[in-house]
Amino acid sequence: MDFHLSKAEESLQKKVEAFVREELIPLEPEFEGAPDIFEGSRWKSRAKLSCDPEVHRYIKIMERLEKKAEAEGLWYLDVPKEYGGLDISNVGMIAVTEELEKTSIPFELGNHVSNILYNCQGEQIERFLLPCIRGEKTSAFGLSEPASGADPSMLQTTATPDGDDFIINGTKMFPTFADR
């Protein structure tokens, strides 16, 4: 495996570094007083369920930042070019993550489509993948279960075919983005 960044990845790393320095770090003092719900990278799932107007004020700030990042080409980073992404390598994504970790603001770049990206086929690409990439839909991910934790070999949830649909039967503990 080549651990060197391509010229495009080096350029992207510098863009992310500038975004963090110019957009995120200046907001750190304001976010120091933010509700605890914004701790960690999975704040979206919890924050959207809140009735607290203060939480929704921070959500608006984050949504503005997401739109700015997308406008600057800092979105769809690991999505293949054929779907409108930048097709950044794993090493490139590590460089991006290193830059994002230089701020205490819990900010991520992208819509988390990697879980469905390589498994969608035919009509599923148009129905699920592309709307997620465009930000029209959000994918949810549920691995953890009460009896198995996050061990995929011990999963008990089943998906039984039922005509054109599936009947899903089981319990998940921490389904990411299930509220969307």
Where are these regions (language model features)?
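Intrinsic disorder at enzyme termini
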Residues: 1-16, 159
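Short amphipathic alpha-helical coiled-coil/interface segments
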Residues: 16-17, 69
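Surface-exposed helix-capping loop/turn segments at secondary-structure junctions
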Residues: 24-31
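Glycine-rich flavin
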Residues: 31-180
